[in-house]
Amino acid sequence: MAQLYYKYGTMNSGKTIEILKVAHNYEEQGKPVVIMTSALDTRDGFGIVSSRIGMRREAIPISNDMDIFTFIAQLEEKPYCVLIDESQFLSKQNVYDLARVVDELNVPVMAFGLKNDFQNNLFEGSKHLLLLADKIDEIKTICQYCSKKATMVLRTENGKPVYEGDQIQIGGNETYIPVCRKHYFNPDI
């Protein structure tokens, strides 16, 4: 029976590497997958899933008004799994579409993304995945400053911590840092 999986982690926790690994494992057995990512994430190009270690692959971009259920249902070849990167940027309707893919098409969906933003608020996609997912797993990484488990994301600009501003600002290592709670509130910058 298919399930909706939500795997979250801070920046640099290996979420995209995990997607690429899962896709490889399915495809190695001749089982097709669909990889999708938020259309908002254009760091490495539109419709590209890219890890910080240099692995990359094309993906179907998801806009907030995309009907993901119909897209998957109308594919000529039914996928064995749907893999979603940057799931924090999904709309509520996108997440409900993913649940329908699982429940009505019996296709497992694995969504990967951040849980909370730099102000420690849930992203819209994360909130609804936490509500609807059958299985929720944390992908762990360590705090950049002390090597404890990182649970938060610190936004920096010009080497200074930032706690206010727009929720969505596409960046990379240069603007977001995985940190523990202590170093979120008292960064060693």
Curated annotation (Swiss-Prot):
Location of the protein in the cell: Cytoplasm
Protein's UniProt keywords contain Zinc: yes
Name of the top EC class for this enzyme: transferase
Binding residues annotated for ATP, in chain numbering: G9, T10, M11, N12, S13, G14, K15, T16, D85, E86, S87, Q88
Pfam families recorded: TK
Coiled coil: none
Domain of life: Bacteria
Catalytic activity, as annotated: thymidine + ATP = dTMP + ADP + H(+)
InterPro entries assigned to the protein according to its UniProt record, in alphabetical order: P-loop_NTPase (IPR027417), Thymidine_kinase (IPR001267), Thymidine_kinase_CS (IPR020633)
E.C. designation(s): 2.7.1.21
GO molecular function: ATP binding; thymidine kinase activity; zinc ion binding
Gene Ontology cellular-component terms listed: cytosol
Active site: E86 (proton acceptor)
Keyword entries, A-Z: ATP-binding, Cytoplasm, DNA synthesis, Kinase, Metal-binding, Nucleotide-binding, Transferase, Zinc
Annotated positions binding Zn(2+): C143, C146, C180, H183
Biological process per Gene Ontology, one example term: DNA biosynthetic process
Family, similarity comment: Belongs to the thymidine kinase family.
NCBIfam families: PRK04296.1-4 (NF003299), PRK04296.1-5 (NF003300)
Assembly description: Homotetramer.
Protein's UniProt name: Thymidine kinase
Taxonomic source organism: Streptococcus pyogenes serotype M1
